[in-house]
Design a protein with these regions (language model features):
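Long, compositionally biased stretches
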Residues: 522, 631-643
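Non-catalytic alpha/beta scaffold blocks inside enzyme catalytic domains
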Residues: 342-630
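Acidic, glycine-enriched active-site microenvironments
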Residues: 48, 64, 152
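Periplasmic N-terminal soluble interaction domains immediately after the signal peptide in Gram-negative
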Residues: 67-68
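A basic, amphipathic helix-loop patch mediating RNA/tRNA/ribosome contacts
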Residues: 19-53
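N-terminal export/assembly segments and adjacent metallocofactor-ligating motifs
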Residues: 1-16, 24, 36, 53-57, ...
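Hydrophobic residues embedded in beta-strands of well-ordered beta-sheets
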Residues: 176, 242-243, 553, 632, ...
Length: 643
């Protein structure tokens, strides 16, 4: 392993490591624009200049392009290197519009930071600036080409990493223009990553444009709830409104990126039609009154129908805390009808997959990226897990063949990321035995339990995509407490009432029961049909835990206070008819924010447990789940197989 010295600090790194990366391991930050850990080095920006004082190479060198070698003595603070970096910044700023006050990147802009750090403050260039006309790239990405510094990050990610073909660079040198051939929405399902990967303000989030500065945002480490992959994110909110979502690095999960669904699906949280106030028979009441009414109706229900006729239903999107407590509540009420999947077929498929993966055969997205063979079995990854498709592309770029097996594995998903895939009818046609790191990717939507069991006879690792962010956790709980056929129980009249906690129940089942209590944050059909509605907090309004498709428990943190967004508050919250408050807080003082009477789903279940005679619940994770209490939201998560 090469041993070198950087700023008087001895460093030892693996062969092939660049000087820039070696400096990072020693805690030394060398300014750079074009280098990115997921993309590698290209040497376009020339900002990472260092001076080599001794060793095989000497003089000013670009640290991102220079492999570390034995005997190197590197200085990042040599006056000659500092002068070089200062000149590079000045060159980059020659054509810059200097529009930081109106740029959404202000406060998180690398160009801004390095310009200040490099001491460039006086513009000496008196010539005419080069200018460009911006393109309309669709509803999500704002294009401001005049801020470009030609680092090539955007086109390298879009074309090489994500396999997009409708965006690239036109021209060369200072005339380079990063664009589509014609205006229009970017086609890649990962185009939103241009916002994160651009070191300046060329690509910004159009959905949050002019809404806040970086330092205005409330942010916390979180987990994407839009599929079972568990991509790590940083949601950003202001004034009780979720404005945007950014990717958070986790090498074991999503790497550096997220899909556009996870980035731009923020509207549901801000929806004014969300359940925000407890309702009893359509009338707004307090939480205490709603809980009193719930207990009274449950007692009346038991007297009328007897014990055991009430079903408790969770869902794949209910955080693990609520699912664990539902099992405890079922024991207190005395019902055997505890369900985590309203549809029987879905529950059976998830249970079969969880049983198959119980021996630790599950493949992470990191495993997929390093696989030497990938099989996509009866699954469309664009729908069931877009970031898994991006992981498959990285395996394909490294030489792994990709097989599409079955009628539910369309070729279009491979074409979306420019993969040359091989289509087959049955998995037995794939020569899995000749590969060392083969991975089979399948989903529970189109794979029956029998097909799942057939995978047990292969040596390949398996990546099973589930129907929700905590479907794996729900499957474990269902396996522990047993599965029931809810539809048959409702049809036969054995179930006459339902308490649904963040569950989407088919309309046919709802029509068969006279008593429904719904605790949810989405305006579902279950909520519309319920006699009692308890509004719960969305994932950005509370702490919680999701278990990903591979059995990895990950904690997400509360990002913002619950309540109606200040922008567009209903008229009843305005100070007066003459002083509407569409964009700033109303001048009315209240003890609770408008629409802010929301509680975590597990807290609602805990209240019922206590009112049914159970012990007070201060912590949902007890017994075998206790190890999850101290889960670090910024870590890689904990594999449930470990305990």
């Amino acid at each position: 392993m090469p041993k070198l010295t950087i700023d008087h600090i001895p460093v030892e790194v693996p062969p092939g490591t660049s000087v820039l990366e070696a400096a990072k391991t020693a805690g030394i930050w060398i300014p750079h624009f074009c280098y990115h850990p997921a993309l590698g080095s290209v040497g376009a920006c020339r900002l990472c200049a260092v001076k080599l004082l001794d060793g095989p190479v000497k003089g000013i060198q670009m640290s991102c392009m220079l492999p570390a070698q034995d005997g190197m003595v590197v200085s990042t603070t040599d006056p000659e290197a500092l002068k070089m970096r200062s000149l590079v910044i000045e060159w980059l700023m020659m054509n810059h519009p200097h529009d930081c006050p109106v740029c959404d990147e202000g406060g998180e802009c690398l160009l801004q930071d390095y310009t200040v750090a490099g001491g460039h403050g006086i513009r000496r260039f008196e010539g005419k600036k080069r200018t460009h006309v911006n393109q309309d790239l669709g509803p999500h990405i704002q294009h401001e080409m005049n801020r470009c510094i030609q680092c090539y990050r955007c086109v390298r990610f879009y074309q090489e990493y994500a396999g997009g073909s409708d965006f690239g660079v036109m021209g060369s040198a200072r005339r380079g223009y990063y664009r589509r051939f014609q205006e229009g929405t970017l086609e890649s399902p990962f185009s939103g990553n241009l916002v994160d990967i651009c070191p300046t303000g060329v690509f910004t989030d159009k959905t949050a444009r002019f809404r806040a500065r970086y330092w205005d945002y409330e942010m916390a480490p979180s987990v994407c709830p839009h599929c079972s992959l568990g991509c790590n994110t940083v949601p950003a909110a202001r004034y009780r409104e979720l404005l945007k979502t950014m990717a958070r690095e986790n090498p074991a999960v999503n790497g550096h990126f997220i899909c556009d669904r996870g980035r731009f699906s923020n509207a549901a949280v801000n929806d004014p039609a969300r359940p925000r106030v407890p309702l009893v028979d359509g009338e707004e009441v307090s939480w205490a009154a709603a809980l009193d009414a719930t207990m009274l109706r449950i007692e009346e229900f038991m007297e009328l129908y007897g014990p055991g006729r009430l079903a408790l239903i969770g869902s794949p999107r209910l955080p693990l805390e609520g699912g664990v407590l539902l099992a405890r509540l079922a024991g207190l009420i005395g019902t055997e009808y505890l369900c985590y999947f309203a549809g029987r077929d879905e529950g059976e498929r998830v249970a079969a997959a969880v049983s198959l993966l119980a021996d630790g055969r599950t493949a992470s997205m990191a495993d997929v990226r390093k696989a030497d063979c990938v099989v996509i079995l009866e699954s469309d990854l664009r729908d069931e897990g877009p970031m898994m498709l991006l992981a498959v592309r990285q395996a394909w770029r490294s030489g792994a063949p990709v097989f599409l097996v079955g009628k539910h594995a369309p070729l279009a998903q491979a074409l979306a990321v420019s993969i040359e895939a091989i289509e087959l009818s049955i998995i037995e046609e794939v020569p899995l035995a000749i590969f060392e790191r083969a991975v089979v990717i399948c989903g529970t939507r189109n794979n029956p339990p029998a097909a799942t069991e057939s995978l047990a006879h292969t040596d390949a690792k398996i990546a099973y995509l589930f129907p929700g962010p905590n479907a794996f956790g729900a499957g474990l709980l269902m396996k522990e407490h047993g599965a029931v056929a809810l539809a048959e129980a409702v049809a036969s009249g054995r179930v006459k009432g339902i308490i649904a906690v963040e569950a989407d129940i088919p309309e046919a089942l709802l029509a068969g029961v006279p008593f429904v209590v719904a605790a949810d944050w989405l305006p579902t059909e279950t909520v519309r049909r319920a006699q009692i509605v308890l509004p719960t907090a969305a994932w950005v309004e509370t702490d919680g835990t999701y278990v990903t498709f591979e059995g990895r428990a990950q904690r997400f943190r509360k990002v913002m206070a619950s309540g109606l967004p200040i922008r567009g508050l209903p008229a009843r919250y305005h100070a007066s008819p003459d002083k509407p408050a569409p964009l700033h807080p109303p001048r009315v003082h209240r003890s609770v924010s408008p629409g802010g009477e929301l509680r975590p789903a597990w807290r609602f279940v805990a209240e019922l447990i206590e009112r049914c005679g159970g012990d007070a619940v201060t912590e949902p994770f007890v017994g075998r789940w206790e190890r999850l209490r101290g889960l670090d939201p910024e870590g890689e998560g904990v594999m449930l197989w470990e305990f």
